[in-house]
UniProtKB/Swiss-Prot annotation:
Gene3D superfamilies: 3.30.230.10
Organism: Arthrobacter sp. (strain FB24)
Key words of the record: Ribonucleoprotein, Ribosomal protein
InterPro entries per the UniProt record, alphabetical: Ribosomal_Su5_D2-typ_SF (IPR020568), Ribosomal_uS9 (IPR000754), Ribosomal_uS9_bac/plastid (IPR023035), Ribosomal_uS9_CS (IPR020574), Ribsml_uS5_D2-typ_fold_subgr (IPR014721)
Region feature (Disordered): 1-34
Protein name: Small ribosomal subunit protein uS9
Cellular component terms per the entry's GO annotation: cytoplasm; small ribosomal subunit
One annotated GO molecular function: structural constituent of ribosome
Family stated for the protein in its record: Belongs to the universal ribosomal protein uS9 family.
Transmembrane spans: none
GO aspect biological process, one term: translation
Composition-biased stretches (Acidic residues): 1-15
Gene transcribed to yield this protein: rpsI
Length: 168
């Protein structure tokens, strides 16, 4: 009987050594996590990119998207834009916790997706600054992309494209 107990203890010790655990994982489990506030607060913000402007409301719900009266998949058929817009929720582990209601105008699909992502990130930041701001800031989702199209200059064909010049 004593021999059986020793072998089971040895097997358990061996399982602990061979299991895929890391020291950092153990440290994270030991450290108490900050409690997030209940998902009852709504947030609203404006996001801009290129010529696009997105007015966004983030409301606690089931993860439903309404963009200009249409679903996310209908408004952004491109999967890349859908993923881009969803990133702030994924990075904060809030996927499906909030409904998004947005009005977007101006620009093209890429600019609109960028504006919507910025608006969502700002809304989530407004909801819970203590927990969300550092994560969103580190990922770069709270930074407004200031790149815009350069204006056309007089005497040139485009912003920088000039007529071909022959020296001789």
């Amino acid at each position: 009987m004593a021999q059986n107990e020793e072998t089971t203890e040895a097997v358990e010790a061996e399982e602990t050594l061979t299991s895929y655990t890391s020291e950092s994982g153990a440290a994270e489990a030991a450290a108490p996590k900050k409690e997030r506030p209940a998902l009852t607060v709504a947030g609203a913000a404006v996001g801009r990119r290129k010529e696009a402007v997105a007015r966004v409301r983030v409301v606690p719900g089931s993860g439903k998207w309404i963009i200009n009266g249409r679903e996310l998949a209908n408004y952004f058929p491109n999967k890349l834009h859908q993923q881009d817009v969803n990133e702030p929720f994924k990075i904060l582990d809030l996927d499906g916790a909030y409904d998004v209601i947005a009005r977007i105008h101006g620009g093209g699909p890429s600019g609109q997706a960028g504006a919507l992502r910025l608006g969502i990130a700002r809304s989530l930041n407004e909801i819970d600054i203590e927990n969300n701001r550092a994560i969103l800031k580190k990922a770069g989702y709270l930074t407004r992309d200031a790149r815009v199209i350069e204006r056309k200059k007089a005497g040139l064909k485009k912003a920088r494209k000039a007529q071909q010049y022959s020296k001789r």
